Curated annotation (Swiss-Prot):
Residues 69-313 form the Peptidase S1 domain. One of its GO terms (cellular component) is extracellular region. The gene is Prss40. Glycans are attached at N44. Its EC number is 3.4.21.-. This is Serine protease 40. InterPro entries: Peptidase_S1_PA (IPR009003), Peptidase_S1_PA_chymotrypsin (IPR043504), Peptidase_S1A (IPR001314), Trypsin_dom (IPR001254), TRYPSIN_HIS (IPR018114), TRYPSIN_SER (IPR033116).
């Protein structure tokens, strides 16, 4: 997202916002009877995967995490198993979210440099990008479907992209899809939801992107409330950012948490009736420096439910056939490079920067 931060830190925190790593590694109790043991030839270890007989509705959004943890902090290993890292030329540029065995959502603005599938990879099963585990997978992209109306009718409108993976993933406790909400879904007023990503922890000090996945609890607000932070565009004013029906806003009421550069395309998920739904994809925000003065803005996934279903159906004849890369394969060796190469991570490019009512708005990757 444009970088999840708490106080002076993205989803993480440099002060009281920084907490210890959460939750031990354990398998999904909901489907323990449907797990099978598989030997990973790369490191001769045995892991558990979900049997392929489970339907998407049975497995999506099911994790052991059901409660609340306060503040921005490092995310535990199995908390957000749909979280993905989008890689351009081997480097993290954006977040993404798994929604099916071979389908991933992200933000359209992450694909301004290239829309060639072979330029991208999707990393799943990671919390620390420098530390692959036996669950980690690096997937090739077969198809990039950018919404045809992206940025067409209003700034950052239809900021969504659908990626078809070249091969299907095997579900495990570390790799599971989030549920996609239907168009008519009702989210309770002031619902507490969670954003996650590997974006910058601070905008004012450009330290390297964090390797560890960070998370933050944000409160959904109505679009009418959100519009109060972003005045409507006036001809000649140079203002173009506004809140439309295809967007959803979320904020920490203390204004201490925000998305930041590198988080774009990552998920905003809400727990609804026992399952986690991806209600938003990180899109844009005001600058993530203190003080945080406005909500974070996400692409509203339910608005695009039909578009997602139609494109998945029309692409069903494209059969993925390439095996995923395992951490032990050459492509996965040292996926981020050692610490000496941290500076090689692509720095976010300011795609849009406007002064709006003394708020510097930016959409960053």
């Amino acid at each position: 997202m444009c970088g999840i931060r708490a106080k002076k830190s993205g989803l993480g925190g440099y002060g009281a916002g920084l907490l210890a790593a959460l939750l031990g590694v354990s398998f999904l109790s909901q489907h323990a009877q449907t797990a099978e043991h598989v030997t990973n030839a790369a490191n001769n270890t045995t892991i558990q995967i979900m049997k392929s007989t489970l339907s998407l509705s049975e497995v999506c959004g099911k994790t052991k995490f059901q409660g609340k943890i306060y503040g921005g902090q490092i995310a535990g290993a199995e908390r957000w198993p749909w979280q993905a890292s989008l890689r351009l030329y081997g480097r993290h540029i954006c977040g993404a979210v798994l929604i099916d065995k071979n389908w991933v959502l992200s933000a359209a603005h992450c694909f301004q440099r290239s829309q060639e599938p072979s330029d991208y990879h999707v990393m799943l099963g990671y919390t620390d990008l420098n530390s692959p585990t036996r669950y980690s997978r690096t997937m090739s992209v077969q198809k990039v479907i950018v919404h045809k109306d992206y940025n067409r009718f209003h700034t950052q409108g239809s900021d969504i992209v659908l990626l078809q993976l070249r091969s299907s993933v095997e579900y495990s406790s570390h790799i599971l899809p989030a549920c996609v909400p239907e168009e008519n879904i009702k989210i309770p007023k002031e619902k507490a939801c969670w954003a996650s990503g590997w974006g910058y922890l601070r905008e004012d000090v450009r330290i390297p992107l964090p390797n560890e996945l960070y998370e933050a609890e944000l409160i959904i607000m109505s679009n009418d409330q959100c519009k109060g932070f972003f005045p409507p565009p006036v001809p000649g004013s140079g203002r173009s950012y506004y809140i439309y029906d295809d967007m959803v806003c979320a904020a920490d009421y203390d204004m201490s948490k925000s998305i930041c550069a590198g988080d774009s395309g990552g998920p905003l998920v809400c727990l609804l009736e026992g399952s986690w739904y991806v209600v938003g994809l990180t899109s844009w925000s005001s600058t993530c420096e203190e003080p945080i003065v406005s909500p974070s803005v996400f692409a509203r996934v339910s608005y695009f439910d039909k578009w997602i279903k139609d494109n998945k159906k029309s692409s069903s004849n494209s059969k993925p056939g390439e095996s995923p890369h395992h951490p032990g394969s050459p492509e996965n060796e040292n996926p981020e490079g050692d610490n000496k190469n941290q500076g090689a991570v692509i720095k976010p490019t300011v795609c849009t920067a406007l002064l709006l009512s003394q708020i510097l708005l930016q959409q960053l990757i």
